[in-house]
Amino acid sequence: MDISLPDAESTVEFGRQLGRALNEQYAEGGEQVHIILFYGDLGSGKTTFTRGFIEALPGGENAEVSSPSFTLCNSYPTTPSVIHCDLYRSEGALPDEVDEALDTESGLVLVEWAERIAAENLPRNVWTSCFKSAKITGW
C-alpha cells in the first residue's frame, strides 16, 4: 500500500492514526505486534512518524520523542511500553541493547534503519514500513 505523506504534520498524524489503531487492537485482545521495522533514507520521516505513533498511545501525550541515533534506544512509559531504536550508526553485529529489545515479548519495539538487521535475525511477527522521500524542484 502506498500512502502519500507530503509534510511532517501529515506524517505525524498518520503515526497517530496507526498508534490509536494498534492500541485498540491491544485493548480488544487482538493479535499483538511487538516489533515495527522502519526502512528509509535519512530524512524520509521515520522519526516523525514515530513521534505521532508514540503520542497516540496512553501515557505518550507529553513524550518528547527524538531520534535515538546516539543513544541507540529510547524508552517511553506508554501503554504498551515502547522501546525506540535507531541503527543508523550500527555496523556489523547488533548492539546488545537492540538485540535484547528484539527478543522482548511485551511492549513494542520500533526500529529505524532496520535494513541493518541481518535477515536471519529478523523476528517473525513484525510490521514493516518503508519510507521514501522525494524532492521536487523547479516549480
Kindly give the residue locations of the regions a language model identified.
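Conserved lysine of the Walker
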Residues: 46
